[in-house]
Amino acid sequence: VLDMIGSEHSPGHETNGGSFGQTISQAAGVAWARRRKKEKGLVWLFLSDGEFQEGQTWEALMSMAFHKISNLKIVVDVNGQQVDGKTCDVMNLEPLLEKISSFGACVKQVDGHDLVALNNAFRTIHQDKPLVVLAKTSPFRGMEILEKRYPFLHYVRFKDENENEEFKSFLNDMKLR
């Protein structure tokens, strides 16, 4: 289980992201440095589709392709959501796969809820290129109660005590499963 926004106390996190869009540059730098030091192992990066609205994300992809950084695997949670609502309403990113490919990355798109598909995508040979796995997910999966909040799912306060109780009841029911 990962924190909503990982930080230095999260298991396996060597760094936290800081401002939106910076993690990809940090991960590229760590992967490049590890390769230069001849260290084995991979750098994994988890980010959201909304981060592709930041120019720094595209610059990092271009740099990774140029420097042939292939010890980096990037998983993008493509759930179409961000703090301000639907990503397509804030700034449409499609066709995301083609755009990322055009920057020199090896890109695979899978059902982000399918662990076998994810595992197969992670095994893709991507010599001299970073691997980007677009994991299409539903932000409601397993928590259909959130659907009525759509498209605003981040940092939303309860409207009233009834809604608060409804969520408490839902969470208590989840503990029984």
Predicted regions and their residues:
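Cofactor-binding active-site loop characterized by glycine-rich and histidine/acidic residues
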Residues: V1-F66
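Conserved thiamine diphosphate
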Residues: K38-K40, C88-A121, K175
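Generic beta-sheet signal
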Residues: G41-L45, L72, Q127-A135
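Acidic, glycine-rich active-site loops and adjacent beta-strand->loop/helix elements
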Residues: L47-E54, V78-Q82, D114-L115, P139
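A short alpha/beta connector and helix-capping loop motif
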Residues: E54-N79, V132-A135
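Short acidic, glycine/serine/threonine-rich loops at helix termini
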Residues: Q56-W58, D84-C88, M143-K148
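A short, conserved beta-to-alpha structural element at the edge of catalytic cores
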Residues: H67-N92, L96, F103
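Glycine/aspartate-rich loop-and-adjacent alpha/beta segment that forms the canonical ThDP
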Residues: L115, A121-R177
